Amino acid sequence: MKRSGLITTKIGMTRLYDDAGAAHAVTVLAVGDCTVIGNRTADKNGYIANIVGMREAKAKHIAKPQAVAAEKAGVKPFRKVVEFRVSDDCIIPAGTALSAEHFVAGQFVDVQATSKGKGFQGAMKR
């Protein structure tokens, strides 16, 4: 069973202590206003996926193809749009809002991230 994911923003890091008093580093993530925009089906697209959007955008800030796709789906345009491949029993209807309640306590998750670009740093000095 492959479930849909969420788009989040990293807030920072902190530590949590277990019962033995050992500290564990944890990353704090903010779950934004994620909404399912649409779905990909095996019949039409060859794979099954949920299309999730985060942070509503003004019409002037998005490309015309994205605006047309959002209008067809009946949702507002979003700044960040991501597809999550899922199994056929985990398709979420378009227009459904996703939140942190999507997960249960103690559940393991896979995380993907984009690191901040630092540009060309030049030659290393001694």
Each predicted region: which residue ranges?
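Extended basic (Lys/Arg/His-rich) segments that typically form rRNA-contacting surfaces
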Residues: 1-126
